[in-house]
A protein has these predicted regions:
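Extracytoplasmic Ser/Thr/Pro-rich, glycosylation-prone low-complexity segments
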Residues: 1-199
């Protein structure tokens, strides 16, 4: 499905909020417009990470780099993080055209990463997480353009028994560790990119 595009369609989402988040950093705490239950825990706030993750339960203060997806070389999802959605975890950074935004009402809460650049490269990556009051959620994608970093899509609850890794693009010449199943193909040339990009 198409993105709601809080950046391009701001007039349709009055009161949308934008976050000036630095490289490998975490947004301020964002109030949800309804309580959201995720793996048995109910949350009323979330925080967006530049690298493409949505964290619940991190509080409102400064957070240690190791407690959110500040790591720019994602390894397979483990219990290092808890109550986290990984719509598109990779090494992303904002440029002058990039935006990280949120907007919500009683029917949905949207978190959007728009025109995010792959670190050290001129590219655009746009995707969203949408939460619903019935505690369901979805990931949506538009352009995706990554050639020098690994990519993870998934979610994690309270511990390692609640890890769901939908996709781990493990390119052999990137990242800090590589599995025996790593591939010598960049993300842009995969069927996963073809499937997700633009819908």
């Amino acid at each position: 499905q198409d993105l709601f595009q809080l950046q391009k369609n701001a007039n349709n989402f009055e009161g949308e909020l934008a976050y000036s988040v630095g490289d490998d950093q975490l947004s301020t705490s964002i109030d949800l417009t309804f309580n959201f239950t995720f793996y048995g825990q109910t949350f009323d706030k979330a925080r967006m990470a530049t690298n493409g993750c949505l964290h619940f339960g991190l509080g409102t203060g400064n957070i240690n780099y190791n407690d959110y997806c500040g790591d720019f070389t994602p390894d397979p999802i483990s219990s290092q993080y808890t109550y986290t959605m990984f719509p598109f975890w990779t090494d992303l950074i904002r440029d002058n055209n990039s935006r990280m935004k949120s907007w919500g009402d009683s029917t949905k809460m949207i978190f959007g990463w728009y025109d995010m650049r792959e670190y050290n490269r001129n590219s655009d990556n746009s995707f969203e997480v949408i939460l619903y009051p019935n505690n369901s959620f979805e990931y949506r994608y538009d352009e995706l353009d990554i050639i020098n970093h690994d990519v993870i899509i998934g979610e994690v609850g309270a511990n390692s028994t609640q890890v769901y890794q939908y996709l781990f693009h493990d390119e052999c010449n990137t990242g800090t560790t590589n599995s025996s199943a790593c591939v010598n193909t960049n993300w842009n040339n995969t069927s996963s990119n073809t499937l997700l990009e633009g819908g």
